[in-house]
Curated annotation (Swiss-Prot):
Keyword presence, Transmembrane: yes
Gene: PTGES
Cofactor annotation: glutathione
Name of the molecule in the record: Prostaglandin E synthase
Reaction(s) this enzyme catalyzes, per UniProt: prostaglandin H2 = prostaglandin E2; 2-glyceryl-prostaglandin H2 = 2-glyceryl-prostaglandin E2; prostaglandin G2 = (15S)-15-hydroperoxy-prostaglandin E2; 1-chloro-2,4-dinitrobenzene + glutathione = 2,4-dinitrophenyl-S-glutathione + chloride + H(+)
Amino acid sequence: MPPPVLALVSGQALPAFLLCSTLLVIKMYVVAVITGQVRLRKKAFANPEDALRHGGLQYCRSDQDVDRCLRAHRNDMETIYPFLFLGFVYSFLGPDPFIAQMHFLVFFLGRMVHTVAYLGKLRAPTRSLAYTVAQLPCASMALQIVWEAACHL
């Protein structure tokens, strides 16, 4: 049996990217579950059929806490999806493994802090700092991808 693909690229950037990106996708699922739990606890449903199932049409309403969860999830989609593309392509540029791991780790930790700050209603500027820190490795990877692509035109 041939060795697993990840064994062939160990010591390179791809395994670190796969770990961080998978953990981030799991985090997004957790935020979605939290959103559902907050909806149930606050009895604030987006659809009439859900409200009817849980007590009546009066529960088809918005709620500040549900909206906060939705904004956190939307922000995840706005930042994590681009990271998935950038990190994947960047992994194949042959970056220094340690530097690549730091890019992925900084993004991962920034997004974790951002989510905790958003859902936990932490004081400003915690959330915006976490957002900014997480965007730095994305900008770095994007610039390196553009540079490499331009050099090979």
